[in-house]
A protein has these predicted regions:
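Cap/insert and terminal regions of metallo-dependent hydrolase folds
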Residues: 6-20, 122, 127, 152-161, ...
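Active-site metal-binding motif and surrounding structural segment of the metallo-beta-lactamase
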Residues: 14, 106-154, 174, 242-248
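Catalytic core of the metallo-beta-lactamase
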Residues: 82-86, 183-243, 259-267
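Metallo-beta-lactamase
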Residues: 1-109, 115-121, 156-226, 245-251, 301-320, 325-328, ...
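Acidic/histidine-rich helix-loop elements
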Residues: 98-115, 200-204, 255-261, 289
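Metal-dependent catalytic neighborhoods of phosphoester/phosphodiester hydrolases
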Residues: 139-148, 290-300, 326-327
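Divalent metal-coordination and catalytic microenvironments
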Residues: 85, 95, 132, 139, ...
Length: 341
C-alpha cells in the first residue's frame, strides 16, 4: 500500500521528493529507446531473444547456512540480487527473493538449478536490508516467512510501509533517506546513499525511495549497490568511505533501451574503478531473464574485466558458495558454461 500518516509527512519533507515523486540526483529518463513505454515493453515481451535463458541446469551449492560460524566474515550469493553477508558476527540478508520475482506466477520464473534456497534455509537474521520495492528485490512471501527470525529491517524511505502492513513491528523498521545513517550499536552503522533508479510495484512510480547502502562493522566497510545506472554516486561513496572492503554491484538486466536505470557493461567497469573496493561481487544475473541480452553475457563481461584488471578483485562464485571475505578463496572457473556431454 502507499505510504500514509507520519511516514508520508516525512516523505513530503525529503529534499529528494518533489512534485509528488522521489527524484534522482540527475535527470534519469526510464526509457531511452525513443519508442515509448508500450512499444518498448512490447519489444521486450515479444521480440525474439537470443539465449536469454540457459539450456542447462546451473550448478549451485547447497550450504547449511545455519551451521556457518557467525564469527566468520563471508558472503553467500543466492542468484540475482539476494545474498547473505556475515561480518563481525552480524548476519545481513539483502533483497531476499526466494519465490517468483513477479506478481504473476508464470512470469520471471527462476532458471533451472537456481531455485535452491528457501526462507526456511536462512539462519536468524540480524539485519534485513531492502534496497527498493521492485518485485525482484522485495518479495512478500519471502520476507513474511522471515519475519519472526529478523532482528531489524533497514530500507529506503517509504518502503517501511510494506513491512508495517505485512505485520512487522514498527519499532524494528528503520527507514533512511539519502545522506542519513543508523547506528546499530557495537561498532555497526548503516549509511543510506543514492542510487540512480526508480521504484514502484504498480503503474504509479517513485512513491518510495531507492538507495544504495554502506555497512560499517568493526573490521569491514561494505557497499551494497542495489539497482541503478551509472552516476557520480559511486565516486562520492569512495571519497566518503575510502578503502572499501567489499562492493556488491549490479551486473545484468541492462539494455540500451533503459541505459540510465541499469548499468551497461562499460558502466560496470567505471563503477568498479570509482569505488576501488578490495573485492567486488557482480550480481543481478543468473536467475531471472529481465532483459534481452544472453543470460551469461553479464558473467562473461565480468570475467573479462577480472582478467583485464586482476587488481579489481572481482569474484564470481556459484550460487550458494560461501566466499570468505578475509582471504582470497580459490573459486571455480567459468562455472556457468554448459557441461560437456
Amino acid at each position: 500500500r502507499a505510504p500514509r500518516g507520519e511516514r508520508l509527512e516525512r516523505i513530503w519533507r525529503s529534499p529528494n521528493y518533489r512534485d509528488g515523486a522521489f527524484r534522482n540526483r540527475h535527470a534519469t529518463p526510464q526509457l531511452t529507446s525513443g519508442k515509448g513505454w508500450w512499444a518498448t515493453m512490447y519489444d521486450f515481451l515479444f521480440e525474439r531473444k537470443e539465449r536469454n535463458r540457459p539450456d542447462h541446469a546451473l550448478p549451485a551449492v547447497k550450504t547449511d547456512l545455519k551451521a556457518l560460524d557467525p564469527k566468520e566474515n563471508l558472503l553467500v550469493w543466492f542468484g540475482h540480487s539476494s545474498y547473505l553477508i556475515q561480518a563481525d558476527g552480524l548476519r545481513i540478508l539483502v533483497d531476499p527473493v526466494f519465490e517468483t520475482a513477479s506478481p504473476l506466477p508464470f512470469f520471471n520464473r527462476p532458471f533451472e538449478g537456481t531455485d535452491l534456497y528457501k526462507p526456511e534455509d536462512m539462519p536468524g537474521i540480524d539485519l534485513l536490508v531492502i534496497t527498493h520495492d521492485h518485485w525482484d528485490h522485495l518479495d512478500y512471501g519471502t520476507v513474511t516467512k522471515l519475519r519472526d527470525r529478523t532482528g531489524r529491517v533497514v530500507c529506503p524511505l517509504g518502503v517501511g510501509e510494506y513491512f508495517e502492513y505485512w505485520g512487522f513491528d514498527p519499532q524494528r523498521i528503520t527507514e533512511l533517506d539519502w545522506g542519513e545513517q543508523a547506528a546499530l550499536g557495537g561498532g555497526f552503522t548503516v549509511y543510506c546513499r543514492p542510487a540512480r533508479h526508480f521504484s514502484g510495484r504498480t503503474f504509479r512510480a517513485n512513491r518510495t525511495l531507492w538507495a544504495s547502502f554502506v555497512v560499517e562493522t568493526p573490521s569491514q566497510r561494505i557497499f551494497l549497490g542495489g539497482d541503478g545506472g551509472y552516476d557520480t554516486h559511486f565516486a562520492d561513496v569512495a571519497r566518503e568511505f575510502p578503502n572499501l572492503d567489499v562492493a556488491v554491484l549490479e551486473d545484468g538486466q541492462y539494455s540500451e533501451d533503459w541505459r540510465y536505470i541499469h548499468m551497461l557493461p562499460a558502466d560496470l567497469k567505471r563503477a568498479v574503478e570509482d569505488l576501488g573496493a578490495r573485492r567486488v561481487f557482480p550480481v543481478h544475473n543468473s536467475k531471472y531473464a529481465l532483459a534481452r541480452h544472453p543470460w551469461d553475457e553479464p558473467l562473461n563481461n565480468a570475467a573479462a574485466l577480472a582478467a583485464e584488471n586482476p587488481e579489481a578483485g572481482i569474484v564470481l562464485p556459484r550460487i550458494g558458495e560461501p566466499v570468505r571475505l578475509d582471504r582470497s578463496d580459490t573459486l571455480p572457473g567459468r562455472w556457468w558454461t554448459a557441461p560437456e556431454n
